[in-house]
Amino acid sequence: MPVLACCVDAAAPPGYAFAGDISFPAPIAFTGVPPATADDTNNSNNHWSPSLSAALYNVDGWGGPYFAVNTAGNISVRPHGSDTVSHQEIDLLKIVKKASDPKSLGGLSLQLPLIARFPDVLKNRLESLQSAFDYAIQSGGYESHYQGVYPVKCNQDRFVVEDIVKFGSPFRFGLEAGSKPELLLAMSCLCKGNPDGLLICNGFKDAEYISLALVANKLALNTVIVVEQEEEVDLIVELSKKLCIKPVIGLRAKLRTKHSGHFGGIFRRRGKFGLTTARVLRVVKNLDLAGMLDCLQLLHFHIGSQIPSTALLADGVGEAAQIYCELVRLGANMRVIDIGGGLGIDYDGSKSCDSDISVEYGLEEYAAAVVHAVQCVCDRSVKHPVICSESGRAIVSHHSVLIFEAVGTSSTNGGGAPPALSAHYLAEELSEDYGYLSELAFRGDYETCLVYTEEMKERCVEQFKQGTVCMEQLAAVEGLCELVRKAVGAAESVRRYHVNLSIFTSVPDAWGIEQVFPIIPIHRLDEKPSVRGILSDLTCDSDGKIDKFINGESSLPLHEMEGGRTYYLGMFLGGAYEEALGGVHNLFGGPSVVRVSQSDGPHSFAVTRAVPGPSCGDVLRVMQHQPELMFETLKHRAQEYVSHDNAAALLAAGLARTFDRMPYLLSLSSFVADDVAAAVPAAQDLGEQWSY
C-alpha cells in the first residue's frame, strides 16, 4: 500500500500553508491502517508487564541478585542478595520520594541527582566473596586461608570504607592504599578493624610514604610495604634501620601472561608497575645483603581489571605461583600471595569473555580457579600461602545507584511542526516534488522516497546558504521530509533525552573510556517503552552524552515523557571509581547521597544518612573562588542599581539562595521565586529599566 497517501493528502498538514495560486495533484486514495490512537497505546500497555520490561532491559542478567522489577513496575533493591525475602525488597521510587519530598511532607528536601547507597548490599558482597573462597579452599583441600583487602581507590567515601572494615572484621578483611592520604585513612579505619587484617601499601613511594607505612607497623597494624620500583628497596632498608622498625616487605612482579582487553594495559610488559624477573632477583640480592631477606613475605601481581575468563586468570596465577615458589627457594620468608584485582563485573549480563564489560564467570568460579592454580604449583614443594585479593570493583560496584531525572526531550533530527511557506517559487518546486513522491508511493518504492526527501532537503539547505531561502521555508521542508519518513514507515528518529546530570561528574568513565553501565527507567516498567533515546547532560560540551548502552545498543528504550510527571532513570553498577574520578566540568558538583538500610516491616527502609550535594558556593570554592566575597560584591551592586531598599534586599536574598543550592536544574515547584518576583514590580514602579 502506498502509505505516503495516508499522511499527505489534499489539505496541507498542520503547520503548512503554501502561498500562491498553486494546484497540487490530488493524492491517490488508499485505504490502510489508521494512525495510532490513545486507545491503541492503552491496548499495548494492557499487553505489557513488568516481567517483559525485566527481559527487555536484561535486569536479571546484570542486576541479579540485587536488583529486580517489582509488580508495581518499579525497580526494587534486594539488599541481601539471594537471601532476600520478598518483604525485604526496597522500592527505589519510594527512596526518591523520601529524599526529594519537602520536609513539610516528611521528606528530606534533597535535590537530584541522587546516589543511594545500600550498606546491606556491601555486606552481602563481602560475605559472598569470602564464602566463595572458603568453599574453594575446603572442597579442594587447600592448606591455608583467604583474606582479602579492599583497595580504597575504588571508592574512598568514609562510610563505604568504614563499613567494609566493620563487615569484614570477622574474616580478617583489610585495606589497600596507593597514596599517602589513602594510607592515612586506611590506618585510621583499621584501628577499629581486625588486627590480623592486612594493610597493603602499593603505589609510588618516597621517604615520607615509607616512613608512614613503618609507623603503621609500629602501631600494630599488619602492614606490608610492596616494592613497585627497584629504587624503593634502598629507602625501605635505610628508613627501617633509622626508625628501628622491622618492616614486612612485598614485591610486585610483572608477569608475561597477556590480558589483551582495555583493562589489561597495566599488566603488559611495558606496563606502569611491577618488577621484571631480573629486577626481582636484584631486589632479593639487595635484601639479602642488608640482612633483611626474611622481611620479604608477600608476592603481589595484577593481571588487570575485568579479567574476562578463568582460563586467563588461571594462567596468570599459575605463573605468579611459580615466582612465589622461586622466592621461597631463594630464601625469602614467603607467606602471602596477593593476586591483585581483576575479579570482574558483568555490566551487561551477557556472561561473555569477548567484551570489556562482561565476564564469563561468577564469584565461585573465580575463587575455584585461583585456589586450584596456586595449589597445583605449590603442591610440588612449597607450603600453601595465604591467598589475598584486591577485589574492589566486585565489592562496591553493586552497592550504589545513581538516580537522575529527564527534564525534556528533542529529536536528534531537529524535526518538528514546520511553519508556513511563503515563497511562490518554492511552492511550485514543492508541487513537483510532491507529485514525484506520490508516484513513488503508488509504486511502493519507499526506499527511493526516503532518498529523494533527503536530496530535497539538501537542495533547500544549499539555497538557504545562498540566501535564496529563508529560515521558515527551510524548517517547512525539513518538516515535510520528517512527515514522509514517518509515512513510509521509516524508523522513528532517536530522541534526545535531556537529563539533570553531568556525565563528567557522575559517570566520567562513560566519557573517558566509553565504559558502558546499565541505565534504565526505575519506574513505569509496567508500561511498554514507545521511543528510543540517547541521554544528553546539562554541560555545555558535545561529549556530555551517553549514546552507548548494554548489548551494543546505540539507543535506549524509553517512555514518552508526560506533562507534570517526573521521569526517573537509574545508572547501576557504578559504585566503583565513578565518584572519585568525577570532576567539576561547568562547575557541576557531585550528587546528593542517601544511605539506605533495610528495616523491620514489609518493604521498609531507613535512611541512616543524608547529605545534600555540593552547592554552587561549594564548587566555586574548589576553583579558588570566594563565594562570600562574591556575594558581597553582588549585594553592593544590587544596592547601587536598585534604588528601592526592599527590592535590593529581596534580590540579595535570591542571590544567597542560589549560592546555597546545587548547580542542577530545579523544578518550578521547588524554586521559591516569590521574593524575586516581588522585587521586579517594585523596581518597575520606580521607572527603572532592567537590562540583561
UniProtKB/Swiss-Prot annotation:
Binding of substrate, residues: I337, D338, I339, G340, G341, G342, L343, G344, I345, D346, Y347
GO biological process, one term: putrescine biosynthetic process
Catalysed reactions, as listed in the record: L-arginine + H(+) = agmatine + CO2
Name of the molecule in the record: Arginine decarboxylase
Lineage top rank: taxon: Eukaryota
Keywords: Decarboxylase, Lyase, Magnesium, Putrescine biosynthesis, Pyridoxal phosphate, Spermidine biosynthesis
Residues bearing the modification N6-(pyridoxal phosphate)lysine: K153
Pathway: Amine and polyamine biosynthesis; agmatine biosynthesis; agmatine from L-arginine: step 1/1
Signal peptide residue numbers: none
Cofactor section: pyridoxal 5'-phosphate; Mg(2+)
TM regions (residue ranges): none
Record-linked PROSITE patterns: ODR_DC_2_1, ODR_DC_2_2
Family according to the record: Belongs to the Orn/Lys/Arg decarboxylase class-II family. SpeA subfamily.
GO molecular function: arginine decarboxylase activity
Entry annotated with the keyword Lyase: yes
Record bears the keyword Transferase: no
Enzyme class: lyase
EC number(s) per entry: 4.1.1.19
